[in-house]
Amino acid sequence: KKQFFINANIVDPHNSINEIGGLIIGEDGKIEAIGKKVNTNNLPTREKPIDLKEKHIFPGLVDMRVFVGEPGYEYKENFRTLSDAALSGGVTSVVTMPNTDPVIDNVSIVDFLKRRGRDKSKINIFPCASLTKNIEGTNMTEFGLLQKKGIIAFTDGTKTIQNPRLMSRIMNSAKDIGCLIMQHAEDSELAKNGMINSGIIASKLGLSGIPEIAERILIERDLTLLEKIKCRYHISQLSSQKSIEVIKHRKEIVKFTSGVSINNLSLNENDIGDFRTFLKLSPPLRREEDRIALVQGLKDELIDVIVSDHKPEDEESKRLTFSQAATGASGIETLLSLSLELYHNDSLKLETIIKALTSNPAKILKIDKGNLSIGNDADFCIVDINKPWIVKKEKLISKSKNTSIEDKKLQGKVINTFVKGKELFKL
């Protein structure tokens, strides 16, 4: 039946809504009405609306960088556990990376993936295919065929296209069929064997470093190619102040988009402390100046998107020495709460944060998600933005517990999450 919510703080950047109001969801799970005009005075008298007491309603989050273990690594995460973890964090749409076993690089594996997603997932899954066969960085995959099968974008995920000739061929193909390509911007030669950001901490811990120039040089290269070959190009994750400077300069010349991981927005290399493998990330955490520059980059609209970079790893692969430990952190459940920290400490406006988590990613992907437009699926979350809680890995829903923020106090928690008008998560 119909559902009525009133007295909510609604933030929907796509429709420029930022007001106290209500939401009406039809029997079909679509949005019928929204905003300040929805209140007790104009509801049918027999209806009992749910009073949200000024809690927030946000569009369901769109997370552009998520690793799921299917196929091949189901012991780390599968579609069912990913869905439940995502829903608890207000995420209703995810873009999945092709770094699976086998790699998502051909039509038959896409069919399998879509079947699994349809059967097991409660959220919207938008799969990526790899740019190159088996993510080896040599032969291109068949963009045209894969796009027809419903692939949303192409990326080698954790790997970079190192060869500039191959990259220009990729860009030409992308331009021809209008598909989106996403680059993990890190020159693999300059970053070779690196574990954490180059600098004082790396030296102190005796770990080989990943210099900031590895990122910058690759961005410079790709944006130079992009001037010649205009295609839909997205830099997956920025991590340094210098990269922001490059982007600021290039934005005036050429059209592209970029993202940042919540890890790089919230943490810096000092958090690694005494070899904490849970903070071995890619791109690495850098200096506090870099973190501040990334926050400023969002403020200045140089960076478009915040991602969780959710990469579940089992205990075994993190309990190794730093150099042997797997890279990545589980983050989809804490993405929104950790992002809200930037609102609570006055770094960013609430609207800027929500835009980077909802309408901006949807716009880049060209999907009609991340908004609360009338007639659209009612994918949204109800959030108490002031509710304090502490991250405890045993409480996490994801199959893998490799959070980068164990024991951190956060402010702001998702209370309910709805997909197509159905409540699929309740705190």
Predicted regions: what they are:
Residues 53-117:
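Metal-associated gating/positioning segment near the N- to mid-region
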Residues 321-324, 377-427:
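C-terminal cap of metal-dependent C-N hydrolases
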Residues 140-306:
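Histidine/acidic residue-rich metal-binding segments in metalloenzymes
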Residues 39-57:
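Active-site metal-binding motif and surrounding structural segment of the metallo-beta-lactamase
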